[in-house]
Amino acid sequence: MKNLGLFCLLLSCIGITSCKNNQSEKVEEAAEIEVEQAMDVSCYRAIYEQDTVDIKMNTDKNGEISGDMVMKVMDMPIKDGEIVGEYRGDTLFVSYTFVQGGYTKKTYKNPMAFLKKGDQLILGNGKIETTMGATYFVKDSPIDFEKVKYKFSKVDCDTK
């Protein structure tokens, strides 16, 4: 009976050890997959009067966009968050999820549209609505890319 107990204990230890090794391999594989998916990394900066907006954008092999955006607007708390979206034609539609002024208990989410012209991104203005907590552009309402504040130029990601 004593030998059976030792055998079960030994078998349990081997099982636990092999599971832990497998988990570390999965973490390494997930990190490799994440690195492989980011096909292109681009950085943009817009300066308007005393406002500065920085974007670091990752494009994966499927054309999906993700990245970070920091908005430093004069006399306003800094908005720091993530963008996720995709191109539809020459227009990039993203959802910007951010915190304001370092207050992490409340998260905001806004839609944004950028028109791509060469190496420049132009942040458009459009009517937005909120329904049941979801904010989106009003359907069939044009987004204005002419009368805008923020025109982003491509910058080196190291100087951002």
Where do the PLM segments sit?
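Short, low-complexity, disordered segments immediately C-terminal to signal peptides
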Residues: 20-38
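Short, solvent-exposed loop/hinge segments that bridge or flank secondary-structure elements
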Residues: 46-64
